[in-house]
């Protein structure tokens, strides 16, 4: 082999040229005018050996500020959670790792069962009747929920709280623009949805009301109070939720939600610089035939043996392209599998315990922050995030924290102009008391 990364030999090239009837590479490209051809040599270094390549890439990777070497208090939708060792072991199996969407389910029983288990666990966590096989991420899941609601109700207006993740709202607006759907944003009041403004925004033309639980500021929204407002005018109630929080919180399905969406990233999926992750989508039975994405169902073959199939496929583009309610081809099955393995490894008790640790440690950090006068004017119960107010730009504070081996919180001023110098702090089960104390002291000493 002449080149390490280009396996064709001169004999291989000659055979290919003979097949197409030309004598040389130059003759192959003879129809390209001389004046537009590049002449000369590219300023590219010679190919590196494997050891040289590994060394160079390792040096580049070492420049990253990762959550293994640094204590991370950054959340805002992507969290530093423990990943059970078994997750990577299972998803690395070749039959899972390289498998594509199972168009022939009779020969993909293992993959279909894994997806079915994911659907079952998500439905149980959310308190809904069924869930699909996954979405791209939490943002697209929320947007797809709004599109489902608009199609189901035949209305062209959706109302979304400003306490919903800003990036999810941006995705929603992108979807809505193409469908000529009006997106109305309801303001926040002390970190929660302003219920008076919400009631005023909802009308008979509203297809859906969208809220987040816990919301972007970490506050647990009062779904019991929002539900009757959301269903006014027969609109659908859509809740975007952190699935880990549902280990402790009342499931949205038991509080009147019609659609529950979110991102399964907290379960066995690394932050990975923002993705890929795994959205989930759960609904009530009445919306079953309008769910986007694949659905795996359980059945029996002619011998009475349990089997799994892709069901309700008439919704999908490879069956009825012009009338499809689903245009997601290759879903996030591998990440859904990772989430399934993590949830299975933890079990109900484990999920509840980790959720409790998140609450406990976040509230300890919040209490410590309060002693320095750092807390922002935000009301309500928190899960694992809360807001603090600083006396200087968050970006400058985070630069100093990095020098101390700490990844600071999210700069809320990026998305909310009125929240300059406000930081969203996330505290997961991985943070120790020493890390929390050091982090809060670094902030507090500059604040006094």
Curated annotation (Swiss-Prot):
Top-rank EC class of the record's enzyme: oxidoreductase
Q: What is its EC number?
A: 1.4.4.2
* Key words, A-Z: Oxidoreductase
**Pfam families attached here?**
GDC-P (PF02347)
| An example molecular function term from Gene Ontology annotations | glycine dehydrogenase (decarboxylating) activity
Quaternary state and partners of this protein?
The glycine cleavage system is composed of four proteins: P, T, L and H. In this organism, the P 'protein' is a heterodimer of two subunits.
- The protein, known as: Probable glycine dehydrogenase (decarboxylating) subunit 1
GO biological process entries: glycine decarboxylation via glycine cleavage system; nucleoside metabolic process
Query: Which residue ranges does UniProt annotate as crossing the membrane?
Result: none
Q: Which domain of life is it from?
A: Bacteria
Tell me yes or no: is Oxidoreductase among this UniProt entry's keywords.
Answer: yes
Signal peptide coordinates: none
The chemistry this enzyme catalyses reads: N(6)-[(R)-lipoyl]-L-lysyl-[glycine-cleavage complex H protein] + glycine + H(+) = N(6)-[(R)-S(8)-aminomethyldihydrolipoyl]-L-lysyl-[glycine-cleavage complex H protein] + CO2
This chain's function reads:
The glycine cleavage system catalyzes the degradation of glycine. The P protein binds the alpha-amino group of glycine through its pyridoxal phosphate cofactor; CO(2) is released and the remaining methylamine moiety is then transferred to the lipoamide cofactor of the H protein.
Oxidoreductase is among the record's keywords: yes
Q: Which organism is it from?
A: Bacillus pumilus (strain SAFR-032)
Q: Please give the family membership noted in the entry.
A: Belongs to the GcvP family. N-terminal subunit subfamily.
């Amino acid at each position: 082999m002449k080149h390490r990364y280009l396996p064709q030999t001169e004999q291989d090239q000659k055979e290919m040229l003979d097949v197409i009837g030309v004598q040389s590479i130059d003759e192959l490209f003879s129809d390209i005018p001389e004046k537009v051809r590049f002449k000369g040599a590219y300023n590219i270094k010679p190919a590196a050996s494997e050891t040289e390549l590994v060394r160079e890439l390792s040096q580049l990777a070492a420049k990253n500020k990762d959550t293994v070497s640094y204590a991370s208090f950054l959340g805002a939708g992507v969290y530093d959670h423990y990943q059970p060792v078994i997750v990577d072991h299972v998803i690395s199996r070749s039959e899972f790792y390289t498998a594509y969407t199972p168009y022939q389910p009779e020969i993909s029983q293992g993959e279909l069962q894994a997806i079915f288990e994911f659907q079952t666990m998500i439905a149980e966590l959310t308190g809904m009747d069924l869930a699909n096989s996954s979405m791209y991420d939490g943002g697209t899941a929320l947007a797809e929920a709004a599109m489902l609601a608009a199609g189901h109700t035949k209305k062209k207006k959706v109302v979304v709280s400003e306490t919903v993740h800003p990036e999810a709202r941006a995705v929603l607006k992108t979807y809505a623009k193409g469908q000529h759907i009006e997106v109305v944003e309801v303001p926040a009041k002390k970190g929660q949805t302003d219920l008076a403004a919400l009631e005023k925004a909802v009308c008979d033309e509203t297809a859906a009301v969208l809220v987040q639980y816990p919301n972007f500021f970490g506050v647990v929204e009062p779904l019991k109070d929002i539900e009757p407002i959301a269903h006014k005018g027969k609109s659908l109630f859509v809740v975007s939720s952190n699935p880990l929080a549902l280990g402790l919180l009342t499931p949205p399905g038991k509080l009147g939600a019609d659609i529950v969406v979110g991102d399964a990233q907290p379960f066995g999926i690394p932050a990975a610089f923002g993705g890929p992750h795994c959205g989930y989508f759960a609904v009530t039975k009445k919306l079953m035939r309008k769910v986007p994405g694949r659905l795996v169902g359980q059945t029996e073959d002619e011998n009475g043996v349990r089997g799994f199939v892709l069901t309700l496929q008439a919704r999908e583009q490879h069956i009825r392209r012009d009338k499809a309610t689903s245009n997601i081809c290759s879903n996030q099955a591998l990440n859904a599998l990772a989430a399934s393995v993590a949830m299975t490894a933890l079990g109900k008790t484990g999920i509840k315990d980790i959720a409790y640790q998140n609450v406990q440690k976040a509230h300890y950090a919040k209490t410590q922050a309060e002693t320095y006068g750092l807390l922002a004017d935000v009301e309500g119960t928190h899960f694992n995030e809360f807001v603090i107010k600083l006396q200087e730009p968050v970006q400058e504070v985070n630069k100093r924290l990095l020098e101390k081996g700490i990844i600071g919180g999210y700069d809320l001023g990026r998305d909310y102009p009125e929240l300059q110098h406000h930081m969203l702090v996330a505290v997961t089960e991985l943070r120790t008391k020493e890390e929390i104390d050091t982090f809060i002291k670094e902030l507090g000493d500059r604040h006094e």
